[in-house]
């Protein structure tokens, strides 16, 4: 299981811990990932994804998973999210 958001592609970043005496030690900044089940209105079922807290807010802001995936770039999405995006597009075309 990778430490990467399935919707935005956010992953670990590197930087320094800096002490009061300005001593620097390397560290990793990990994304705030959560396992969530988002409801797809088009598919009529839940989709389990591992996404960041920022991505969850973005999904709510855009009006749900279907609207978020419609505007999302394919290169940012994981294989699972890309599969769901194609399922949604196919279901919307059939309806």
From Swiss-Prot:
GO molecular-function term, one example from the UniProt record: structural constituent of ribosome
Pfam families attached to this UniProt entry: Ribosomal_L28
InterPro entries associated with the record: Ribosomal_bL28, Ribosomal_bL28/bL31-like_sf, Ribosomal_bL28_bact-type, Ribosomal_bL28_sf
Region (Disordered): 1-22
Keyword terms of this UniProt record: Ribonucleoprotein, Ribosomal protein
Keyword Chaperone: no
GO cellular component: cytosolic large ribosomal subunit
Alphabetical GO biological process terms: translation
UniProt family annotation: Belongs to the bacterial ribosomal protein bL28 family.
NCBIfam families documented for this protein: L28
Protein name as catalogued: Large ribosomal subunit protein bL28
Species for this entry: Ruegeria pomeroyi (strain ATCC 700808 / DSM 15171 / DSS-3) (Silicibacter pomeroyi)
């Amino acid at each position: 299981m990778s430490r990467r958001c399935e919707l935005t592609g956010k992953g670990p970043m590197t930087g320094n811990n800096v002490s009061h005496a300005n001593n620097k030690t390397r560290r990793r900044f990990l994304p705030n990932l959560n396992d969530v089940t988002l409801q797809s209105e088009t598919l009529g079922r839940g989709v389990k994804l591992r996404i960041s807290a920022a991505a969850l807010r973005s999904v709510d802001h855009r009006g749900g998973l279907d609207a978020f995936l419609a505007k999302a770039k394919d290169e940012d999405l994981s294989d699972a999210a890309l599969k769901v995006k194609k399922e949604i597009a196919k279901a919307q075309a059939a309806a």
